[in-house]
Amino acid sequence: MRFPPLLFFQDSEAVKRIANSVRGTKDDDAEIKDHSMRFIRNAISGDQQKEILNVDMLRYIAWVLVALNENIVTARTVIRERDAVEDALKNQQPEDIENFADDLKINMKYNRDLERFEIGVFDFVKYASRVTGSQYRLSNQSVIKGIVYCQKDVAIKILRESFVSNMFKVIDSIDQTTASPVLSDQTDSINELREFYKKSVYAKLTIGRGNTKAFPPCMKEIIRNLHEGINVPHMGRLAIASFLHKVGYTEDEIVEYFRNAPDFDESITRYQIKHLSGEISGVEYSPPKCETMRSNHLCFMDDDKLCHQDWMKHPLTYYEVKSRRLG
Protein backbone atom coordinates (compact mmCIF):
# COMPACT_ATOMS: atom_id res chain seq x y z
CA MET A 1 0.00 0.00 0.00
CA ARG A 2 1.55 3.29 -1.12
CA PHE A 3 0.56 6.97 -1.40
CA PRO A 4 1.78 8.73 -4.58
CA PRO A 5 3.43 12.17 -4.67
CA LEU A 6 1.35 15.28 -5.37
CA LEU A 7 2.45 15.49 -9.01
CA PHE A 8 0.83 12.11 -9.68
CA PHE A 9 -2.55 13.46 -8.60
CA GLN A 10 -2.17 16.59 -10.74
CA ASP A 11 -1.87 14.64 -14.01
CA SER A 12 -4.95 16.04 -15.76
CA GLU A 13 -4.26 14.15 -19.00
CA ALA A 14 -4.49 10.79 -17.23
CA VAL A 15 -7.73 11.87 -15.59
CA LYS A 16 -9.18 13.06 -18.89
CA ARG A 17 -8.25 9.78 -20.58
CA ILE A 18 -10.10 7.82 -17.91
CA ALA A 19 -13.10 10.17 -18.05
CA ASN A 20 -13.38 9.70 -21.81
CA SER A 21 -12.98 5.92 -21.74
CA VAL A 22 -15.75 3.68 -23.04
CA ARG A 23 -16.51 0.08 -22.15
CA GLY A 24 -15.09 -2.31 -24.72
CA THR A 25 -12.12 -0.11 -25.64
CA LYS A 26 -9.77 0.51 -22.71
CA ASP A 27 -11.49 -1.65 -20.13
CA ASP A 28 -8.98 -0.79 -17.39
CA ASP A 29 -9.72 2.93 -17.69
CA ALA A 30 -13.47 2.33 -17.92
CA GLU A 31 -13.35 0.16 -14.80
CA ILE A 32 -11.42 2.86 -12.92
CA LYS A 33 -14.07 5.40 -13.89
CA ASP A 34 -17.10 3.23 -13.07
CA HIS A 35 -15.65 1.87 -9.84
CA SER A 36 -14.67 5.35 -8.65
CA MET A 37 -18.15 6.74 -9.24
CA ARG A 38 -19.70 3.79 -7.39
CA PHE A 39 -17.31 4.35 -4.50
CA ILE A 40 -18.41 7.99 -4.13
CA ARG A 41 -22.08 7.07 -4.43
CA ASN A 42 -21.70 4.40 -1.76
CA ALA A 43 -19.88 6.88 0.48
CA ILE A 44 -22.83 9.27 0.14
CA SER A 45 -25.28 6.54 1.12
CA GLY A 46 -23.21 5.66 4.20
CA ASP A 47 -21.85 2.31 3.02
CA GLN A 48 -19.15 1.36 5.54
CA GLN A 49 -17.64 -1.53 3.58
CA LYS A 50 -13.87 -1.15 3.68
CA GLU A 51 -12.07 -1.11 0.34
CA ILE A 52 -8.53 -0.08 -0.55
CA LEU A 53 -8.53 1.88 -3.81
CA ASN A 54 -5.66 1.69 -6.25
CA VAL A 55 -3.79 4.92 -6.91
CA ASP A 56 -5.50 5.57 -10.26
CA MET A 57 -8.93 5.38 -8.62
CA LEU A 58 -7.76 7.60 -5.78
CA ARG A 59 -6.60 10.23 -8.28
CA TYR A 60 -9.77 10.06 -10.37
CA ILE A 61 -11.97 10.33 -7.27
CA ALA A 62 -10.06 13.42 -6.12
CA TRP A 63 -10.81 15.17 -9.41
CA VAL A 64 -14.48 14.18 -9.35
CA LEU A 65 -14.82 15.51 -5.80
CA VAL A 66 -13.34 18.84 -6.87
CA ALA A 67 -15.73 19.07 -9.83
CA LEU A 68 -18.67 18.07 -7.62
CA ASN A 69 -17.73 20.69 -5.01
CA GLU A 70 -19.87 19.34 -2.16
CA ASN A 71 -18.07 19.41 1.20
CA ILE A 72 -20.05 16.60 2.78
CA VAL A 73 -19.51 14.27 -0.17
CA THR A 74 -15.79 15.02 -0.06
CA ALA A 75 -15.65 14.36 3.69
CA ARG A 76 -17.64 11.13 3.48
CA THR A 77 -15.57 9.80 0.60
CA VAL A 78 -12.22 10.57 2.22
CA ILE A 79 -13.37 9.17 5.56
CA ARG A 80 -14.60 5.97 3.91
CA GLU A 81 -11.16 5.38 2.42
CA ARG A 82 -9.48 6.53 5.64
CA ASP A 83 -11.19 3.70 7.52
CA ALA A 84 -10.10 1.20 4.87
CA VAL A 85 -6.50 2.43 5.12
CA GLU A 86 -6.54 2.06 8.89
CA ASP A 87 -7.92 -1.47 8.62
CA ALA A 88 -5.31 -2.47 6.03
CA LEU A 89 -2.41 -1.06 8.07
CA LYS A 90 -3.30 -3.35 10.96
CA ASN A 91 -2.20 -6.31 8.83
CA GLN A 92 0.97 -4.70 7.44
CA GLN A 93 4.52 -5.56 8.47
CA PRO A 94 6.58 -2.83 10.20
CA GLU A 95 8.63 -2.13 7.05
CA ASP A 96 5.44 -1.65 5.01
CA ILE A 97 4.12 0.77 7.60
CA GLU A 98 7.44 2.64 7.47
CA ASN A 99 7.15 2.91 3.67
CA PHE A 100 3.60 4.23 3.88
CA ALA A 101 4.69 6.77 6.50
CA ASP A 102 7.52 7.84 4.22
CA ASP A 103 5.01 8.41 1.40
CA LEU A 104 3.07 10.68 3.76
CA LYS A 105 6.27 12.59 4.66
CA ILE A 106 6.30 11.27 8.23
CA ASN A 107 9.56 10.00 9.68
CA MET A 108 8.40 6.82 11.39
CA LYS A 109 10.72 3.93 12.22
CA TYR A 110 10.12 0.63 13.98
CA ASN A 111 12.36 -0.08 16.96
CA ARG A 112 12.58 -3.87 17.07
CA ASP A 113 14.30 -3.94 20.46
CA LEU A 114 11.52 -1.94 22.12
CA GLU A 115 8.77 -3.21 19.80
CA ARG A 116 7.60 0.37 19.41
CA PHE A 117 7.29 2.82 16.53
CA GLU A 118 9.36 5.99 16.75
CA ILE A 119 7.72 9.25 15.62
CA GLY A 120 8.87 12.85 15.95
CA VAL A 121 6.93 14.66 18.67
CA PHE A 122 5.76 17.39 16.24
CA ASP A 123 4.12 14.90 13.86
CA PHE A 124 2.67 12.97 16.76
CA VAL A 125 1.02 15.98 18.38
CA LYS A 126 -0.20 17.32 15.04
CA TYR A 127 -2.17 14.19 14.17
CA ALA A 128 -2.91 12.65 17.58
CA SER A 129 -4.91 15.74 18.51
CA ARG A 130 -7.49 14.68 15.90
CA VAL A 131 -8.04 11.25 17.45
CA THR A 132 -10.50 10.61 20.26
CA GLY A 133 -9.22 8.66 23.26
CA SER A 134 -6.79 9.22 26.13
CA GLN A 135 -4.52 6.41 24.89
CA TYR A 136 -3.52 8.65 21.97
CA ARG A 137 -2.47 11.62 24.10
CA LEU A 138 1.21 12.56 24.30
CA SER A 139 1.08 12.33 28.10
CA ASN A 140 0.41 8.59 27.79
CA GLN A 141 3.41 7.89 25.53
CA SER A 142 7.12 7.45 26.19
CA VAL A 143 9.00 10.51 24.92
CA ILE A 144 12.79 10.68 24.81
CA LYS A 145 14.68 13.61 23.25
CA GLY A 146 11.82 14.65 21.01
CA ILE A 147 10.98 11.12 19.85
CA VAL A 148 7.68 9.45 20.73
CA TYR A 149 7.74 5.69 21.24
CA CYS A 150 4.27 4.25 20.67
CA GLN A 151 2.52 0.97 20.03
CA LYS A 152 1.37 -0.12 16.59
CA ASP A 153 -2.29 0.81 17.07
CA VAL A 154 -1.30 4.36 18.05
CA ALA A 155 1.10 4.67 15.10
CA ILE A 156 -1.67 3.53 12.74
CA LYS A 157 -4.01 6.24 14.05
CA ILE A 158 -1.31 8.82 13.32
CA LEU A 159 -0.95 7.54 9.76
CA ARG A 160 -4.71 7.41 9.33
CA GLU A 161 -5.05 11.10 10.17
CA SER A 162 -2.04 11.96 8.03
CA PHE A 163 -3.68 10.16 5.11
CA VAL A 164 -6.78 12.34 5.54
CA SER A 165 -4.64 15.48 5.69
CA ASN A 166 -2.75 14.49 2.55
CA MET A 167 -5.95 13.68 0.67
CA PHE A 168 -7.34 17.12 1.43
CA LYS A 169 -4.04 18.67 0.30
CA VAL A 170 -4.45 16.78 -2.98
CA ILE A 171 -8.03 17.96 -3.38
CA ASP A 172 -7.10 21.56 -2.52
CA SER A 173 -4.30 21.48 -5.10
CA ILE A 174 -6.75 20.80 -7.95
CA ASP A 175 -8.38 23.91 -9.41
CA GLN A 176 -12.13 23.53 -9.84
CA THR A 177 -12.08 25.64 -13.01
CA THR A 178 -9.67 23.04 -14.42
CA ALA A 179 -11.46 19.97 -13.07
CA SER A 180 -14.80 20.67 -14.73
CA PRO A 181 -13.42 20.90 -18.31
CA VAL A 182 -11.17 17.86 -17.78
CA LEU A 183 -14.23 15.87 -16.69
CA SER A 184 -16.61 17.43 -19.23
CA ASP A 185 -17.59 14.01 -20.60
CA GLN A 186 -18.74 13.08 -17.09
CA THR A 187 -20.89 16.16 -16.44
CA ASP A 188 -24.14 14.16 -16.45
CA SER A 189 -22.72 11.52 -14.11
CA ILE A 190 -21.42 14.17 -11.72
CA ASN A 191 -24.79 15.94 -11.74
CA GLU A 192 -26.48 12.62 -10.96
CA LEU A 193 -24.17 12.24 -7.97
CA ARG A 194 -25.12 15.73 -6.82
CA GLU A 195 -28.84 14.98 -7.04
CA PHE A 196 -28.37 11.68 -5.23
CA TYR A 197 -26.48 13.51 -2.49
CA LYS A 198 -29.18 16.16 -2.08
CA LYS A 199 -31.94 13.58 -1.82
CA SER A 200 -30.11 11.30 0.61
CA VAL A 201 -28.47 13.88 2.86
CA TYR A 202 -30.74 16.93 2.86
CA ALA A 203 -33.85 14.80 3.30
CA LYS A 204 -32.43 13.28 6.48
CA LEU A 205 -31.45 16.65 7.91
CA THR A 206 -35.02 17.96 7.68
CA ILE A 207 -36.51 15.00 9.54
CA GLY A 208 -37.70 15.70 13.07
CA ARG A 209 -40.44 17.05 15.28
CA GLY A 210 -38.74 20.31 16.20
CA ASN A 211 -39.44 23.49 14.24
CA THR A 212 -35.98 24.27 12.84
CA LYS A 213 -37.01 27.87 12.08
CA ALA A 214 -37.30 28.41 15.82
CA PHE A 215 -33.84 27.07 16.63
CA PRO A 216 -31.51 29.61 18.28
CA PRO A 217 -28.47 30.83 16.29
CA CYS A 218 -26.06 28.74 18.40
CA MET A 219 -27.83 25.49 17.50
CA LYS A 220 -28.16 26.46 13.85
CA GLU A 221 -24.42 27.13 13.71
CA ILE A 222 -23.56 23.79 15.33
CA ILE A 223 -25.87 22.02 12.87
CA ARG A 224 -24.28 23.90 9.96
CA ASN A 225 -20.80 22.83 11.10
CA LEU A 226 -21.89 19.20 11.48
CA HIS A 227 -23.59 19.37 8.10
CA GLU A 228 -20.37 20.59 6.47
CA GLY A 229 -18.20 17.95 8.12
CA ILE A 230 -16.47 20.42 10.46
CA ASN A 231 -15.21 19.00 13.75
CA VAL A 232 -17.50 20.31 16.52
CA PRO A 233 -16.06 20.34 20.09
CA HIS A 234 -17.48 18.04 22.76
CA MET A 235 -19.52 20.77 24.46
CA GLY A 236 -21.09 21.70 21.12
CA ARG A 237 -22.04 18.08 20.44
CA LEU A 238 -23.54 17.70 23.90
CA ALA A 239 -25.48 20.94 23.43
CA ILE A 240 -27.06 20.04 20.09
CA ALA A 241 -27.80 16.43 21.04
CA SER A 242 -29.52 17.39 24.30
CA PHE A 243 -31.33 20.27 22.58
CA LEU A 244 -32.68 18.05 19.80
CA HIS A 245 -33.80 15.49 22.37
CA LYS A 246 -35.62 18.14 24.39
CA VAL A 247 -37.52 19.50 21.37
CA GLY A 248 -38.79 16.07 20.38
CA TYR A 249 -36.28 14.41 18.07
CA THR A 250 -35.85 10.64 18.27
CA GLU A 251 -32.51 8.89 18.70
CA ASP A 252 -32.43 7.94 15.00
CA GLU A 253 -33.16 11.53 13.97
CA ILE A 254 -30.43 12.93 16.22
CA VAL A 255 -27.89 10.42 14.87
CA GLU A 256 -28.43 11.76 11.33
CA TYR A 257 -27.20 15.20 12.41
CA PHE A 258 -23.89 13.67 13.52
CA ARG A 259 -23.33 11.37 10.55
CA ASN A 260 -21.07 13.87 8.74
CA ALA A 261 -18.80 14.47 11.74
CA PRO A 262 -15.16 13.67 10.80
CA ASP A 263 -14.86 11.06 13.58
CA PHE A 264 -18.45 9.75 13.41
CA ASP A 265 -18.98 6.38 15.07
CA GLU A 266 -22.62 5.36 15.13
CA SER A 267 -22.38 3.02 18.12
CA ILE A 268 -20.63 5.66 20.26
CA THR A 269 -23.05 8.36 19.11
CA ARG A 270 -26.07 6.23 20.02
CA TYR A 271 -24.59 5.40 23.41
CA GLN A 272 -24.02 9.09 24.18
CA ILE A 273 -27.56 10.00 23.11
CA LYS A 274 -28.99 7.25 25.31
CA HIS A 275 -26.86 8.55 28.18
CA LEU A 276 -27.94 12.19 27.94
CA SER A 277 -31.59 11.25 27.38
CA GLY A 278 -31.57 9.35 30.68
CA GLU A 279 -32.10 5.92 29.15
CA ILE A 280 -28.75 4.72 30.52
CA SER A 281 -27.81 7.26 33.18
CA GLY A 282 -31.26 7.77 34.68
CA VAL A 283 -30.62 11.52 34.44
CA GLU A 284 -32.03 13.51 31.54
CA TYR A 285 -29.58 16.23 30.52
CA SER A 286 -30.62 19.70 29.44
CA PRO A 287 -28.64 21.84 26.96
CA PRO A 288 -26.09 24.22 28.52
CA LYS A 289 -27.42 27.66 29.42
CA CYS A 290 -26.43 30.71 27.38
CA GLU A 291 -23.66 31.73 29.79
CA THR A 292 -22.01 28.31 29.40
CA MET A 293 -22.39 28.46 25.62
CA ARG A 294 -20.65 31.86 25.58
CA SER A 295 -17.78 30.71 27.82
CA ASN A 296 -17.19 27.79 25.43
CA HIS A 297 -17.23 30.05 22.35
CA LEU A 298 -20.45 28.47 21.10
CA CYS A 299 -22.64 31.59 21.14
CA PHE A 300 -23.42 33.06 17.72
CA MET A 301 -26.12 35.62 18.53
CA ASP A 302 -24.81 38.31 16.14
CA ASP A 303 -27.69 40.79 15.68
CA ASP A 304 -30.50 38.41 16.68
CA LYS A 305 -32.82 40.64 18.74
CA LEU A 306 -34.30 37.80 20.75
CA CYS A 307 -30.84 36.67 21.88
CA HIS A 308 -30.08 40.17 23.14
CA GLN A 309 -33.03 40.29 25.53
CA ASP A 310 -31.83 40.50 29.14
CA TRP A 311 -34.09 37.62 30.13
CA MET A 312 -32.78 35.29 27.44
CA LYS A 313 -30.72 32.82 29.48
CA HIS A 314 -31.24 29.46 27.77
CA PRO A 315 -31.47 28.01 24.23
CA LEU A 316 -34.70 26.21 25.13
CA THR A 317 -36.24 29.51 26.23
CA TYR A 318 -35.35 30.94 22.85
CA TYR A 319 -36.96 27.97 21.12
CA GLU A 320 -40.18 28.20 23.14
CA VAL A 321 -40.59 31.95 22.61
CA LYS A 322 -39.69 31.84 18.92
CA SER A 323 -42.04 28.89 18.32
CA ARG A 324 -44.95 30.87 19.79
CA ARG A 325 -44.10 33.89 17.66
CA LEU A 326 -43.99 31.76 14.53
CA GLY A 327 -47.37 30.30 15.42
Curated annotation (Swiss-Prot):
Signal peptide: none annotated. Binds 1 [4Fe-4S] cluster. Pfam families: DNA_primase_lrg. GO terms for biological process: DNA replication initiation; DNA replication, synthesis of primer. The keyword 4Fe-4S applies. The keyword Ribosomal protein does not apply. Its cofactor is [4Fe-4S] cluster. NCBIfam families: PRK02249.1-3. Belongs to the eukaryotic-type primase large subunit family. This is DNA primase large subunit PriL. It comes from Thermoplasma volcanium (strain ATCC 51530 / DSM 4299 / JCM 9571 / NBRC 15438 / GSS1). The gene is priL.
